[in-house]
Amino acid sequence: LYGFALCPAIAEVQARFWEEEKALAAAMEVGLCTVNYEDFFSRTTMYGKEYMGPDFAVPFTEKYENFYGDGPFDLENRYITEDVPVGCYLMSQLGKKYGVDTPIIDSMILLASTMLKRDLAAESKYTLDYLDIGHMTHEQLQQYLREGVYIPK
């Protein structure tokens, strides 16, 4: 799937998306694995190095035959119907809560909604309130994440 749809322009979007995730993680004081900007610019994306070793990369100028499966055949698949209204939408909400701009993440929500002709964010039940963390301050959320101490509304 990634190997057939990936090109330098899409890799740039992925890298910028990752930068927004890193900014959000920093604001929330949580750690993330290290992914370098250059790691996105491979036919195997950042996952090539993760699964095949730190020196593994396939430049866009080279053909790579080692892809499995054909990927989805339409837009009604989990890469959109789950990743966007759950992952992207929650990151967008956390960005608003923490004052972190998420224009790339927000654009993913808008583009996916436009392609599917429905509002994926409005349809999503996955809000910070649904997770019962919307009311928490930064300090309370830290206590919950690090110590498991939940502060109810």
Regions found by a protein language model. Name each.
Residues 1:
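A conserved mid-domain beta-alpha-beta active-site/ligand-binding segment of alpha/beta enzyme cores
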Residues 4, 8-153:
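NAD(P)-dependent Rossmann-like dehydrogenase/reductase catalytic/cofactor-binding core
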